């Protein structure tokens, strides 16, 4: 477990939603765990993790929360803010974990979409998470602002958006939407474009 708050430079470097994220080989995961009691929710924990050699950050979080001995009679909501979306294998493990813990719901807001050499695997992993009930979204200014004020040692400095934050969020949101679209809708769109001569 890393210290509770991230350094400003580390957060800005790793979470910046730039198109070409050279040199960013680590994945950071900021999390909030809440227990839902009827109409209210109670925060149980928050913090951040980063991948360690040989273990992706998503699996580190699953190990961490598995040690909690969660009450199966209560509902829990976990929210992740990640610098990269999960790889295929991590998505598979997370979906399986949720299947065995139906009282736990997960939302993931990611800064960037991760694609390995096999560009078909990661999108399938995201679809698998979506089918498992995970809400997946791209981080927007509001999410960065929340993270800055919750997870970053900000020394009372206000979060300032970098050039391109909004445009890159919109571009990535469109890309994620295309990935999560049911395949028949994608085929319908392709047919429509063919009919229009595109």
From Swiss-Prot:
Residue numbers binding Zn(2+): 56, 87, 90
Protein name: Single-stranded DNA cytosine deaminase
Source superkingdom: Eukaryota
Subcellular location field: Nucleus; Cytoplasm
Residues with PTM Phosphothreonine: 27
The encoding gene: Aicda
Motif segment (Bipartite nuclear localization signal): 1-30
Region Important for interaction with CTNNBL1, annotated ranges: 39-42
Catalytic activity: a 2'-deoxycytidine in single-stranded DNA + H2O + H(+) = a 2'-deoxyuridine in single-stranded DNA + NH4(+)
Organism encoding this protein: Mus musculus
């Amino acid at each position: 477990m890393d210290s509770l708050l991230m350094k400003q430079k580390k957060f800005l470097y790793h979470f910046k939603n730039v198109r070409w994220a050279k040199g960013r080989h680590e994945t950071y995961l900021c999390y909030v765990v809440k227990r839902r009691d009827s109409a209210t929710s109670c925060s149980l924990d928050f913090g951040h993790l980063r991948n360690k050699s040989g273990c992706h950050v998503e699996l580190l979080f699953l190990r961490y929360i598995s040690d909690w001995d969660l009450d199966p009679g209560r509902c829990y909501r976990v929210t992740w803010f990640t610098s990269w979306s999960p790889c295929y294998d991590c998505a598979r493990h997370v979906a399986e974990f949720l299947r065995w813990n139906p009282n736990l719901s997960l939302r993931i807001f990611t800064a960037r979409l991760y694609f390995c050499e096999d560009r078909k695997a990661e999108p399938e992993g995201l679809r698998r998470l979506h089918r498992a009930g995970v809400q997946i979204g791209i981080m927007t200014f509001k999410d960065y602002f929340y993270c800055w004020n919750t997870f970053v040692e900000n020394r009372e400095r206000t979060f300032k958006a970098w050039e391109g934050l909004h445009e890159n969020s919109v571009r990535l949101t469109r890309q994620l939407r295309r990935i999560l679209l049911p395949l028949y809708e994608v085929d319908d769109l392709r047919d429509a474009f063919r009919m229009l001569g595109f």
